[in-house]
Amino acid sequence: MPKPEKEKEMMTAIGLMSGTSMDGIDAALLQTDGEKVTGFGAAVSISYEEDFKNQLRGLLGRDPDGEAHAGAIAEDLTRRHAEAVREVLKESGLAAKDIGVIGFHGHTVLHRPGDGVTRQIGDGALLADETGIPVV
């Protein structure tokens, strides 16, 4: 007789996205069992100002490891994502302790799948420090 499937634990998560359009950050609250999204909550969008967009554009197509200013841009980007998280928390009336995890991939600045190369900027550890929430 097959074992009954173990009930999955529900988690509240915040997902972050900053796409190649470089218009800004989208952040959304969701409920998940780790495999499926079972509910949605507050969502916010934070626009980038033109100066920051230009800084990101300056990294496109380059390996950020070879760019002296990439670290400062990555830190700025990460702090902007932390602000988006704080806005979602404010909109939802939740606190950091109520969130199980933040999904964060940074911002892709180099993507050549044919060569097996992709590079993102962003600092998950800094985001976790800034928000008090684990980051994956």
Question: What is each of the regions a protein language model found here?
Answer:
Residues 1-136:
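Short acidic/glycine-rich loops and adjacent helix/strand connectors
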